[in-house]
Swiss-Prot record:
Its main location: periplasm. This is Chaperone protein FanE. The keyword Signal applies. Keywords: Chaperone, Disulfide bond, Fimbrium biogenesis, Immunoglobulin domain, Periplasm, Plasmid, Signal. It comes from Escherichia coli. Residues 1-19 form the signal peptide. NCBIfam families: PRK15211.1.
């Protein structure tokens, strides 16, 4: 009997536990001078959902607003699509490198039916929004080829010598993935322009490659060159 009740409870809990919204991209590039960027949000569920959109600053003063989504709040019927436009309202951003932000699309699930014993989860879809100055518009393709291996004390480090943000998911030496600590993994996922991430005290005498995602979310392997 208890097992049967547990299965029923799990089914009730799971009815709204899966993400309802899907986005048309895993990252959005806002080129300087662009009028807006469109975010297509699709409700994959069988229920009407509310939605809320906002943008968080990653490496800037949290009180300064650079982008405004429209609409910020909306309702979305089952299997329907909502287009949200992101507009740059403050161009006081660096012109010699990219700036990065988090774009948040929060699901607002319908109220559970019944006696209040069931739960619904409000899932937040968070993806990168990258502001690219006009001077950098044409140099992004294959920019990961400019990642260098440098020595910093006893550590070996990867250096991003470019003005672009990289999203690195894996680092390999002679075809074998190395075990990075959580701090290094996080920094690799948002590899800032003109910065370095140290790999620790590892043997880097062999062939070093990184797997990185480009503007379209496609993973590609790149060979890391040693700094001369």
């Amino acid at each position: 009997m208890n097992k049967f009740i547990s299965i029923i409870a799990l089914c009730v809990f799971s009815s709204y536990a899966n993400a309802a919204f899907t986005l048309n991209s895993t990252r959005y590039i806002y080129n300087e001078g662009q009028q807006s960027v469109s975010v297509n949000i699709h409700n994959e569920s069988e229920h009407k959902y509310g939605g809320q959109v906002w943008i968080d600053n990653i490496d800037k003063n949290g009180e300064v607003v650079f982008f405004s989504p429209s609409p910020m709040v909306f309702k979305l019927n089952p299997k329907q699509k909502q287009i949200v436009r992101i507009v740059n309202i403050n161009d006081n951003l660096p012109k010699d490198r990219e700036s990065i932000f988090w774009l948040n699309v929060q699901e607002i699930p319908p109220a559970p039916k019944g006696d209040g014993g069931s739960l619904s989860l409000a899932i937040n879809n968070r993806v990168k929004l990258i502001y690219r100055p006009i001077a950098l518009k044409n140099g992004r393709d294959e920019a990961e080829n400019n990642i260098k291996l440098i020595n910093s004390g006893t550590d070996s480090c990867l250096e991003n010598t470019t003005p672009y943000y990289f999203a690195i998911s894996d680092v390999k030496i002679n075809g074998k993935s190395i075990d990075l600590n959580s701090d290094a993994k996080n920094k690799m996922g948002v590899f800032s322009p003109f910065s370095k991430v140290c790999l620790g005290n590892v043997n880097t005498s062999g062939n070093i490659t990184v797997t990185a995602f480009n503007d379209y979310g496609v993973a590609t392997s790149y060979t890391v060159q040693r700094s001369k």
